[in-house]
């Protein structure tokens, strides 16, 4: 997906480590976006031909559920394109299933020429534990920039105390709280909705 100048988004997989009830991509046609070797070659060719692309974003699904072999094939191709300066990966794996990140995965993420930015998705401080701390330490020591995005969810984190605790816990684990999103309107998730007015008051 090449929607904005300077960056391109790759839907790396339709699989996730956890299924979020409020996911805005639940009806995305993942079957049409299978990441086989032929598709990877086509994507890399497109990025190579567009020298204005400086950032590649891997999303999904969750790109870190890919095998180290498949992820390595994609990352090696991206890293060989000299005008790509940043690789941004959006994932919930570090907090919901950190065991999926093997030594091979970590080696891939920490050996890139391009700057790697890992945008985690943590909505509540209770999602952070000793396992996530150990993993974040390894990634940070390997030069990976760690950011976080949260979705404002009614009854989960729509109060100042929880949001403050979340920010503090993220900072303690070396992750910068970066995005706080309003919920996208998806079927079956209206009970999580927080009004924009309340969201603005929480941020004031």
Q: How should these model regions be labeled?
A:
Residues 4-6, 17, 52, 174:
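Short, well-ordered loop/turn elements at secondary-structure boundaries
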Residues 30-32, 60-61, 89:
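Surface-exposed cleft-lining segments at the edges of enzyme active sites
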Residues 41, 45-55, 64-203:
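Conserved AdoMet/S-adenosylmethionine-binding subsite of the radical SAM
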Residues 23-35:
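Iron-sulfur (Fe-S) cluster-binding segments and ferredoxin-like electron-carrier domains
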Residues 12-26:
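Local cysteine-cluster metal-coordination motifs and their immediate loop/turn environment
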């Amino acid at each position: 997906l090449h929607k904005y100048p300077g960056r391109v988004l790759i839907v790396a997989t339709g699989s996730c480590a956890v299924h979020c009830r409020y996911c805005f991509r639940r009806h995305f046609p993942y079957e049409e976006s299978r990441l086989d070797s032929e598709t990877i070659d086509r994507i890399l060719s497109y990025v190579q031909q567009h020298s204005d692309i400086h950032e590649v974003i891997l999303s999904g699904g969750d790109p870190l559920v890919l095998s180290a072999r498949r992820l390595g094939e994609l990352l090696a191709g991206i890293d060989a394109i000299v005008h790509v300066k940043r690789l941004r990966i959006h994932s919930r794996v570090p907090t919901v299933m950190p065991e999926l990140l093997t030594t091979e995965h970590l080696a891939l993420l920490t050996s890139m020429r391009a700057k790697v930015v890992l945008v985690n998705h943590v909505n509540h401080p209770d999602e952070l534990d000793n396992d996530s701390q150990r993993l974040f330490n390894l990634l940070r020591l390997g030069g990976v920039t760690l950011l976080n995005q949260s979705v404002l969810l009614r009854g989960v984190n729509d109060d100042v105390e929880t949001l403050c605790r979340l920010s503090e816990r993220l900072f303690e684990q070396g992750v910068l709280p970066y995005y706080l999103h309003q919920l996208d309107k998806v079927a079956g998730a209206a009970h999580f909705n927080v009004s924009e007015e309340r969201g603005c008051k929480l941020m004031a």
